Amino acid sequence: RSGTVGGNICLDTRCYWINQSETWRESIDWCHKCDCGTGADCRVIPNQNTLCVATYQADLAPVLMCLDATIHLASPQGKRSMPLCDFFKLDGMTRNILEPGEMVTHITLPEDASDWSGDYQKLRQRESWDFPEAGVAVLWKGGEGDGPSSLRVATTGLESIPSLHSEEAEDALENWSGLETVEILSESIRKAVKPVQNTWFSPSYRRKMVKVLTKRACRKLLVS
């Protein structure tokens, strides 16, 4: 079997209230994403039926976002393109801006994509093929001194969309001092993510591991 880049980017959001059999859901009531006309409440954050918080768990998006990728769409109505960061929509139901009948045709990278170095680290249940419970991509361009000239960080598996942490990366770049800055950056990314209780690991553990994953992804940066 094989997959596609577009298929990975458009991966449906996951939540253990929706990723179940019909019999299982029927036995304990439905959920906001799969209410089958019952108007069921969100099981993760009750008493609000305005937002589904199912988690986006694809691996490619954070790396491509750090590379400033452009996604290209086509439909019978025409074509359109946008930065990949603008493709996602903070809603576990819709998850992106694709219209009915529209599809991803291709993704392009800027000319300087090969100038970037980086690493991607993920938390998963098994050390094999698996969806990330948390994923962190760190990409950088080498500088003339000890630190990088450019730095980008993005995460996945923690909310309904992948996130590019531009402010945290810019702060780290402006105040670069090696290992100390990596520690500060890792903590700032940990504080920025907002996982909820809808995957295998608890939100608190996933946030703690985001800090660890960010440090791991920065290891090559410290020795490059």
Protein language model features and the residues they cover:
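C-terminal structural segment of proteins
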Residues: 1-224
